[in-house]
Amino acid sequence: MCIRDRYSPASINFCPYERRYFTERNAGKIDAVRNQISLWHEGGLIGPSENCLLVADLLEAASGIANIAGTYGCFLKKWTQQSQGELAIKERDLMPQCVVHKMSVGDVFDIKVEQHDVVYLDPPYTKRQYASYYHIPETIAYHDEPSVEGVAGLRPWKHNASPFCYKSKALQAIYDCVNGLSADRIYLSYSSQGHVELSELVNCLAGLGGVRLHSLGEIGRYRPNRVAASKEAVVEEYLIEVDKAPGD
């Protein structure tokens, strides 16, 4: 009962905090579904692909009834209308034919690419650490029972902290990432909301090859609360093209 006991009002029975990420009913359903998927997988009734598919469907369904403002950094004090709905797992539309592709999960600094590959990078722009902002989906996916702490009930995450999210480390991290990739052509997505000034970033990457800056225009700024809503309403999105091929 990991989700129910940690992330619903039932948490008050186990810690000083009444967490409201999910209603007790929905949290119990999440636990039940996740346990059943695990039993099917361990019993050989489904394979690794089916296991991943069903867990992904559960994560999507859980997000649909979570009492949050976009991420799981913390729960909302008052219940939203969305959170009062019932957990519902929808059938996913699958492609009728197999598509040959390859995916990997790991540290971007460890990714191996070929010179002829084209790489697209979309690093975090701000201080928001994904490891902490999405801790509950991590717990559902791993199906473990970590020790959690604080009002938000965070699982241990600092070992997964991203250097891109620290203002003092972001520029060097981006440079090291681009420099370490063997691909000749690299595209980097960045924002005016980011830690690094755009001109500073472009000048830094210019030492690796030809750099072209493409403006993608303005988008609405994410505003989860009144404080954020009072700030600048839009941000500029950019695509930085780095061509490392000799002579280009």
Describe every region a protein language model picked out:
Residues 4-95, 127, 131, 135-167, ...:
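Class I S-adenosyl-L-methionine-dependent methyltransferase module
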Residues 5, 113-133, 189:
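Conserved proline-anchored active-site loop of SAM-dependent methyltransferases
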Residues 102-104, 214:
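General small-molecule cofactor/ligand-binding pocket signal
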Residues 105-110:
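Conserved SAM/SAH-binding loop
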Residues 115-119, 149-162, 234, 245:
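Mobile, glycine- and charge-enriched loop segments
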Residues 163-209, 216:
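Conserved Class I SAM-dependent methyltransferase catalytic core
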Residues 198-204, 208-247:
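Class I S-adenosyl-L-methionine
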